[in-house]
Amino acid sequence: MGRLEGKSVVITGAGSGIGRAASVLFSREGAKLVIVDKTEAVKETAKLVSDAGGTVEAVIADAGSENDVKAFIDKAVAKYGRLDAIWANAGVSGGLVPLAEQTVEHWQEVLRVNLIGPFLAIKHSMPHMIKQKSGSIVCTASVAGLKAGASGHPYGASKAGVISLVQTTAYSLSGTGVRINA
């Protein structure tokens, strides 16, 4: 029996990288998954999980869209009866464009996915978890949110925002049985 046996978990950004690896690992530990990505690649991740005997539902959705986030969280609750954990992992790098050449639209897109996305995941998962008096919320951050480097301006700013969002949310969740980390 795995450490996540029977737990209902949502993972965004599950089409590749950390999200794909987490989906496979969580499934091996017994989690029942709803995995989300904006691309068809999420179906490949679902096949890896399913072929290994895991329980999984793949959803193609935009982790920065409030309607999509609410829908995939509600889908997990409807399918599995509860939501034990969510990992807001979807993100975009934004590239290494000189600041003077960046556009407001470029910044808005990076912030929409990397910061608004985790905010929406928190906003729509918290009520379910508070009602259960348990749950775990994880948001992918980065050292780029703590220290300047070559990661790009909007990326670093978005990850600094995620760190602050998680810290302030942890304070507000005190005593609810729900924990949050980045």
Spans of model-derived segments:
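Active-site loop-to-helix junction immediately N-terminal to the catalytic Tyr of the SDR YXXXK motif
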Residues: 102, 148-156, 168
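Substrate-binding pocket helix/loop in short-chain dehydrogenase/reductase
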Residues: 97-99, 106-108
